[in-house]
């Protein structure tokens, strides 16, 4: 694989078969961030976003992206698209300009793209950036991580602002999704789903990984089962799809089923062509 475009493995592959990582580090400073863990935590999970060490400046970053996206274009399109990003928030003030340049290039090549972020300033404060993507919206889906736990994400935009930004994009014809991952508390996650639903086209729900005591205050899997039933009931009434990630199925001991449930391959850009579970 290339310096910036690659095929994710493991749990990350549930999000996208291809991803682009231009930066490492993130100023959102989320306490649960996976990138902060392990021997590479000081590099991957640093508090300041920096270009990857193999890239010297933005010019080289874009040139590298252009070369790699041209090389892998047909495979990326065949597999469903390209995600920005697993190693940082792609819409931080330090990262958004290069991200948008690469997204515009990729969608101009008819490559579907996903953006996953906790930032809203590029939409709510600087609407020029969002407006510039209007021509790409048929090939672009924008997702916001919603936990309802602002105290665990001190550098990120408040969850309420993310819901507002999602609605802003949705009202302008953008495809939107909510990443309800990690679930911190079932109550907060259900509240986020209810709040985001009017401006959201797809929900993805996953549990916190790597912390055995994360749900010590709950009776598992019974309380998780109740949460799943509440979410499925609400989204079925609203006609909105939800993808329950493998972490949920594993904790329950069985796959999650329901009229609103979809698989990992659900195509938010072409929902009518996607078979639901």
Listing of model-derived features with the role each one plays in the protein:
Residues 1-81:
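N-terminal [4Fe-4S]-dependent radical SAM core
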């Amino acid at each position: 694989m290339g310096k910036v475009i690659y095929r994710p493995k493991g749990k990350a592959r549930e999000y996208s078969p291809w991803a682009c990582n231009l930066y490492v580090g993130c100023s959102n400073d989320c306490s649960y961030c996976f990138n902060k863990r392990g021997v590479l935590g000081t590099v991957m999970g640093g508090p300041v976003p920096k270009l990857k060490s193999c890239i010297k400046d933005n010019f080289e970053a874009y040139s590298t992206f252009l070369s790699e996206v041209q090389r892998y274009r047909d495979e990326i399109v065949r597999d469903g698209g390209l995600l920005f990003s697993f190693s940082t928030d792609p819409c931080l003030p330090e990262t958004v300009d290069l991200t948008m340049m690469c997204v515009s290039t990729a969608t101009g090549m008819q490559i579907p793209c996903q953006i996953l972020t906790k930032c809203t300033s590029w939409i709510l404060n600087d609407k020029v950036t969002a407006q510039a993507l209007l021509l790409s919206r048929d090939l672009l889906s924008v997702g916001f991580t919603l936990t309802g736990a602002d105290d665990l994400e001190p550098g990120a935009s408040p969850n309420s602002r993310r819901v507002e930004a999602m609605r802003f994009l949705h009202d302008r014809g953008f495809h939107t999704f909510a990443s309800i991952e990690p679930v911190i508390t079932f109550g907060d996650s259900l509240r986020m789903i209810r709040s985001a639903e009017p401006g959201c086209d797809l929900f993805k729900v996953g549990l916190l990984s790597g912390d055995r005591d994360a749900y010590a205050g709950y009776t598992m899997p019974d309380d998780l089962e109740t949460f799943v039933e509440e979410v499925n009931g609400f989204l079925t009434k609203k006609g909105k799809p939800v993808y329950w990630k493998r972490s949920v199925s594993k904790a329950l001991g069985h796959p999650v089923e329901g009229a609103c449930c979809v698989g990992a391959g659900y195509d938010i850009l072409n929902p009518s062509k996607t078979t639901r579970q």
